[in-house]
Amino acid sequence: MSHQLTFADSEFSTKRRQTRKEIFLSRMEQILPWQNMTAVIEPFYPKAGNGRRPYPLETMLRIHCMQHWYNLSDGAMEDALYEIASMRLFARLSLDSALPDRTTIMNFRHLLEQHQLARQLFKTINRWLAEAGVMMTQGTLVDATIIEAPSSTKNKEQQRDPEMHQTKKGNQWHFGMKAHIGVDAKSGLTHSLVTTAANEHDLNQLGNLLHGEEQFVSADAGYQGAPQREELAEVDVDWLIAERPGKVKTLKQNPRKNKTAINIEYMKASIRARVEHPFRIIKRQFGFVKARYKGLLKNDNQLAMLFTLANLFRVDQMIRQWERSQ
């Protein structure tokens, strides 16, 4: 496929000021290990034959990444390729040749879902980060977040998604799913991900979030009782689990007497604060606030891709912080 620029594209590429989107895409161009990622998908990707020639795999992967960075539907992604030159150039496309339509973009997503390739990408990238010395193993921070799903029954099936469930948090009811994550305490990178319906108790998935090499586990008060769970009896770690808010409030009523206990709670809070970084990236940076698809499998695929990209975004943040400190 030709990468030759049209007049409009070449005019755009020579303009002086870079937009925030251009700067972001340029950073992602440099940080993503494209060869490692395409190697995961290549065995399953259609080969050129007698039929319609498929778009280059890396082009479709780049489009798929942009969908997640900018929270775009298949149709919105097709429109963006026509309307936004920086996104078209990032995908190595130009207006002088055919651009992938929404069906082609959707079929690529379905390919990843069918073979659970987003999960494989998550593992591949994390292995690459561990080999590079970025992902450590000393400690794991765990947390879970509720992801809302459409609760309306005004659809073709006239029912809510049967794989999503209702749960109460505080005084508010939520309908949807949960993303449970295990995060490297040193770097803030996500090493484990489990998706469930929203009514699943956080503690039930704790064992699936540990990699087995950590020396300590940090969590909020929702994980109280973890050391007593039968499935965690053999886990030999220091449990840094926050006390329940009521107990902390009682401690603060006599701060002089309980100074040490209060300081320990502050220490626990400062350690586990980093677990919020991945959620902040996918929600605020990438704009992911609601389950887009029906069923846990499709949404698990999207979340695995989001956390893969969030890890790489976090590495880019770390590199830029280091550069500023020099």
UniProtKB/Swiss-Prot annotation:
UniProt KW Iron-sulfur keyword: no
Biological process according to GO: DNA transposition; positive regulation of DNA-templated transcription
Example GO molecular function: DNA binding
Entry keyword annotation includes Ion transport: no
Keyword annotations from UniProtKB, A to Z: DNA recombination, DNA-binding, Transposable element, Transposition
InterPro entries for this protein: Transpos_IS5, Transposase_11, Transposase_InsH_N
One Pfam family from the record: DDE_Tnp_1
A single cellular component GO annotation: cytosol
Family the UniProt entry places it in: Belongs to the transposase 11 family.
Function: Involved in the transposition of the insertion sequence IS5.
Name by which UniProt lists this protein: Transposase InsH for insertion sequence element IS5Y
Name of encoding gene: insH5
